[in-house]
Amino acid sequence: MARYRGAVERLERRFGVSLALKGERRLSGKSALDKRAYGPGQHGQRRAKTSDYGLQLKEKQKAKMMYGISEKQFRSIFVEANRLDGNTGENLIRLIERRLDNVVYRMGFATTRSSARQLVTHGHVLVDGKRLDIPSYFVRSGQKIEIKEKTKSNSQVVRAMELTAQTGIVPWIDVEKDKKYGIFTRYPEREEVVVPIEERLIVELYSK
């Protein structure tokens, strides 16, 4: 499945939660979901009964859309999560949070994960001082993530950092805002990752 490129706010209304796909509008309270907290379309306010499979599939689609991950990549991450010790669902979320594009977003260098992915793919991000343009790269504990010198004054990066001041930085990351770099200090615990995803349903789906 290719990445979704349609009306993202309509998508958020379908899932009934914010997927952090629209940066400034989400923070301003002016998103379509804030105004109409029900599904899109003529019958959007009706609550249709959904099967167990439908709920599981919807949860997987929600996670993929939120993080901007293709089906192939998502399944690959699940396989790795299942291989690791511990709870597969928690491993899944923790692995996804380690993706470079997501870490750039979490550090506040971009207002959305999509924008963070563009920064990475266009070569604007350094990992331990070396350019890395692979969004799916798993960041390791202790690694330094930095915006390239020429990009530090970019208006979108500066604006993103200003908006991040409203929401704060997650506890497993330290950021030097003035110098536009951050340290991925440790792997997050599941309870620290605030995302509207029931990973248990995704595990059930892939375990069939």
Swiss-Prot record:
Keywords: Ribonucleoprotein, Ribosomal protein, RNA-binding, rRNA-binding
Gene Ontology terms: cellular component: small ribosomal subunit
Single GO term (MF): structural constituent of ribosome
One Pfam family linked to the record: S4
One Gene Ontology biological process: ribosomal small subunit biogenesis
Residue numbers spanned by region Disordered: 31-51
Segments passing through the bilayer: none
CDD domains: S4
Ranges of residues in domain S4 RNA-binding: 98-160
UniProt-listed PROSITE patterns: RIBOSOMAL_S4, S4
Function: One of the primary rRNA binding proteins, it binds directly to 16S rRNA where it nucleates assembly of the body of the 30S subunit. With S5 and S12 plays an important role in translational accuracy.
Protein family (similarity comment): Belongs to the universal ribosomal protein uS4 family.
PANTHER family per UniProt: 30S 40S RIBOSOMAL PROTEIN (PTHR11831), SMALL RIBOSOMAL SUBUNIT PROTEIN US4M (PTHR11831:SF4)
Self-association state and partner proteins as the record states: Part of the 30S ribosomal subunit. Contacts protein S5. The interaction surface between S4 and S5 is involved in control of translational fidelity.
NCBIfam families: PRK05327.1 (NF003717), rpsD_bact (TIGR01017)
Designated name of the protein: Small ribosomal subunit protein uS4
Native organism: Helicobacter pylori (strain ATCC 700392 / 26695)
Taxonomic lineage: Bacteria, Pseudomonadati, Campylobacterota, Epsilonproteobacteria, Campylobacterales
Gene, per the UniProt record: rpsD
